[in-house]
Amino acid sequence: MTAGAAAEPATAPSHMTRVSAWPGRIVGLDLARAAAIIGMLAAHVGDSGLRGDDAAGWGWLWVADGRPSAVFAVLAGTTISIMSASDRVGSGHTAVRVATRAVILVAVGLVLNALGTPVAVILGNLGVMFLLVIPAIRWTPRALAVAGSGVLVGGAVAFRFVEGAWDGIPVAEAVTHYYYPAMAWTGYVLVGMAVGKLRLREPAVASALVWTGALGTAVTYGVAILVGAAAPWQTATGPWWASLTAHSTSPFEMVGNTFVALLVIGVCLWIARPTPVFLPALAFGSMSLSVYSAQIVVIAIAGDQIVWHPSNVAFAVLTLALMAAATVWRVFLGAGPLERALTLASTKAADAVAAPRGSGSGPRP
């Protein structure tokens, strides 16, 4: 699994150079994962003119502030539902797999945080969110959507009063930490789980996600601006609860980000095809956990200045280099290194704990 990878063969088939061979994968989700990772790269090292000495960056890069990580979290939830649907052993087996992945995500997050980069690493927080949603694995799409909406709004309001309460407490601080507070961000994962239970291969579902996302984003942003909030690309003003500023964790920001995620996923489901044209992006998205981790390592090696004094040249070079590496890896080796490790570890743990005696594990996402 990347934070959200679907079914993955253990090794690359000999004909992997034909991009039509993406067995078991919903390529639109891989494209959406690629979009989320590129967005986070832009947020970390891209120049929007709002950070560093250069005020002449690409102003439109404001779209990469906060939203890509929300898309990433929604896609993670989508993967959980796809895992559950493909698990022939049962929900208990899926729960152990999700819990194992959660522990590994927390561990990888701690390692990446230890590198001391200025980047707020999402993986540890995402691991905590995985643990929190385990009881919801068998819920219906409607129940997941309602619960997700409640957590997004209710968690955002509650966060206002407990922000940073557990800072300094390893792992637990993920619940109330500023950038990705699990008490609110778990709503993204729940909504993603609802999406993952839909028939994502059907064009009508992609269309519904596009229209829901587009209209929802327009209404949410429009209402927030009408009640006095600044537009997302402007300096923050207005009431806190209507703020559209990235990582403000206001109810409007959380809901708006959710609709943006639905729009991105819907568009990617619409346009993605398993053809050579899409190979680099699909390879990039299919190993998003490995790519995300690699960019943190690169930033650690390059030094903090690559973040505090961003350059769109650095953004473009880093993105293209990682995409090229992912493409070569995918063609010759198949699943990404961290994705493969995550799949093997979670499957073995689940088979040992929850599989009926004598049952075969079969392929796992």
Outline where the language-model segments fall:
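Alpha-helical transmembrane segments and their immediate juxtamembrane cytosolic regions
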Residues: 2-365
